[in-house]
Design a protein with these regions (language model features):
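Acidic (Asp/Glu)-rich catalytic clusters
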Residues: 41, 70-78, 113-116, 145, ...
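Conserved beta-strand positions
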Residues: 18, 49, 84, 122-125, ...
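Active-site mouth loops of central-metabolism enzymes
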Residues: 20-30, 90-102, 131-132
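Active-site groove signature of glycoside hydrolases
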Residues: 112-131
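Beta/alpha (TIM)-barrel catalytic core signal, keyed to glycine-rich beta->alpha loops juxtaposed to Asp/Glu
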Residues: 132-320
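Structural motif corresponding to the early beta-alpha repeats
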Residues: 52-53, 75-99
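Short, acidic/polar
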Residues: 28-39, 99-115, 163-167
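N-terminal binding-site loop/beta-alpha segment at the start of enzyme catalytic domains
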Residues: 1-80
């Protein structure tokens, strides 16, 4: 497994990051540990989680994923880069979510307890909270770093102008700088390229995108004429409707069919093609890959092993999916 510099920091991370949001609902603990073992065996030493996971759960299940990851990490914490996130609703009170100093400082403590560690490598804001001044959030993240409870900080699902403002405010106030972003990015959703990508390249920000396989649609296993398969992202608890709204449309399926043909010509699976396309973008640090079974990691591991796509194949994919750069951000 190759490694890549994490933005402008001195940290290096594996070219694939294992996403864990299926752990605790879509996957039971035994399945989750099998996936973690397979990822480890494949050379992945970068893990991403969040306090609100598992995906599709509710407040009753929030935190289960971190607990599963923490139990598996026992005795091998130093072998991994661990990233987690806060901002989501973790309790019944209005202050149990968001970017307030109170919530961030309490959330990091709770995450560390669940993960069974005294620090995380990357602590990220899982979304943007318009009710909290950005300086308050940055000062809280700075405190987390200075207390030794996180090494770096990042954001997920932030628009480019908010990242730019945070960079400016952190420089002005001498607080911890945003070192990574976690956007949604794949062949069917390329809005990241319009403004956030050039900002990241110019400012030296690591990019760890999620959904490189569009929730599984880019594996080619789904058929539009049928109902979504049970046990997939498209039927998973409260998240099923969100994933169907994102990707379950005629236009997406038409594009997938065209991509399937290119994959056949290139003699690789559609999933491997899709992940190699993401890895071919030089701005990308490590796409976050997920699985509900260990064997599902094989296509992504093959993508990393084979490396960037040949220039002619990438050019065909870029041209075919160029219109997906203009998809509304709320999709």
């Amino acid at each position: 497994m190759n490694h890549k510099k994490f933005g402008r920091t001195g940290l290096r991370v594996s070219r694939l990051c294992l996403g864990t949001m299926t752990f605790g609902l879509q996957c039971d603990e035994a399945q989750s540990q099998a996936i973690l073992n397979a990822a480890h065996d494949g050379g992945i030493d970068f893990l991403d989680t969040a306090d609100v996971y598992p995906l599709g759960g509710d407040r009753a299940t929030a935190g289960k994923t971190e607990e599963i990851v923490g139990r598996w990490l026992k005795g091998k914490r130093q072998q991994f880069i661990v990233a987690t996130k806060c901002v989501g609703q973790m309790g019944p009170k209005p202050w149990d979510q968001g970017m307030s100093r109170k919530h961030i400082l309490e959330a990091i403590e709770a995450s560390l307890k669940r993960l069974g560690t005294d620090y995380v490598d990357v602590y990220q804001l899982h979304g943007f909270d318009p009710l909290t001044p950005i300086d308050e959030a940055l000062e809280a993240l700075d405190a987390v770093v200075k207390m030794g409870k996180a090494r770096y900080v990042g954001v997920s699902n932030w628009l480019a102008h908010r990242v730019a403002r945070a960079l400016g405010r952190s420089e002005l106030k001498s607080t911890a700088r945003i070192d990574s972003v976690q956007p949604r990015y794949n062949l069917l959703f390329r809005t990241f390229e319009r403004d956030l990508l050039p900002l990241c390249e110019e400012e030296g920000i690591a990019v760890i995108p999620y959904n490189p396989l569009a929730g599984g649609l880019l594996t080619g296993k789904h058929e539009q004429n049928g109902t979504p398969q049970q046990g997939t992202r498209f039927t998973l608890g409260r998240a099923g409707a969100m994933y169907q709204a994102r990707y379950w449309h005629e236009r997406e399926f038409e594009t997938v069919e065209q991509l399937r043909g290119i994959a056949r010509e290139a003699d690789m699976s559609l999933a491997t093609l899709a992940v190699r396309w993401v890895l071919s973008n030089t701005a990308i640090t490590a796409p976050i890959i997920g699985a509900s079974r260990p064997e599902q990691l094989a296509d992504s591991l093959a993508a990393e092993e084979k490396g960037p796509l040949p220039a002619d194949v990438k050019a065909r994919l870029d041209q075919l999916t160029d219109s997906w750069r203009a998809v509304a951000a709320d999709r």
